């Protein structure tokens, strides 16, 4: 389990324990945070689970792959710390990480 912090679009902070083996997307949806649409269900084909990752944790994440990079390129809100939450597996190294849900495109 890892402590995860999620900032929603209205600035609300949600803190909770996320099970190892889940993705950040799955953990957020299990908390009932509905604004993370994740329309494709985690297949890396829609970019509706776009989040901004806390800078200190970027090096602890798996490398950005081609499909994810291409989908993020389609966002008007892409930043250097943009990732798709469906591509971020939860593990102890992510304990304390904050992600912010990106604005809708």
Curated annotation (Swiss-Prot):
Its EC number is 1.14.13.-. GO terms for molecular function: 2 iron, 2 sulfur cluster binding; electron transfer activity; metal ion binding; monooxygenase activity. One of its GO terms (biological process) is P450-containing electron transport chain. Optimum pH is 6.0. Optimum temperature is 25-30 degrees Celsius. It catalyses: 5,5'-dehydrodivanillate + NADH + O2 + H(+) = 2,2',3-trihydroxy-3'-methoxy-5,5'-dicarboxybiphenyl + formaldehyde + NAD(+) + H2O. Binds 1 [2Fe-2S] cluster. Disruption phenotype: Disruption mutant shows growth defect on DDVA. [2Fe-2S] cluster binds at residues 40, 46, 49, 86. It holds the Pfam family Fer2. The keyword Electron transport applies. Residues 2-105 form the 2Fe-2S ferredoxin-type domain. Gene3D superfamilies: 3.10.20.30. Its cofactor is [2Fe-2S] cluster. Keywords: 2Fe-2S, Electron transport, Iron, Iron-sulfur, Metal-binding, Monooxygenase, NAD, Oxidoreductase, Transport. The keyword Electron transport applies. Signal peptide: none annotated. Involved in the catabolism of 5,5'-dehydrodivanillate (DDVA), an intermediate in the biodegradation of lignin. Part of a three-component monooxygenase that catalyzes the O-demethylation of DDVA, leading to the formation of 2,2',3-trihydroxy-3'-methoxy-5,5'-dicarboxybiphenyl (OH-DDVA). LigXc probably functions as an intermediate electron transfer protein between LigXd and LigXa. Monomer. The three-component monooxygenase is composed of an oxygenase (LigXa), a ferredoxin (LigXc) and a ferredoxin reductase (LigXd). Belongs to the adrenodoxin/putidaredoxin family. This is 5,5'-dehydrodivanillate O-demethylase ferredoxin subunit.
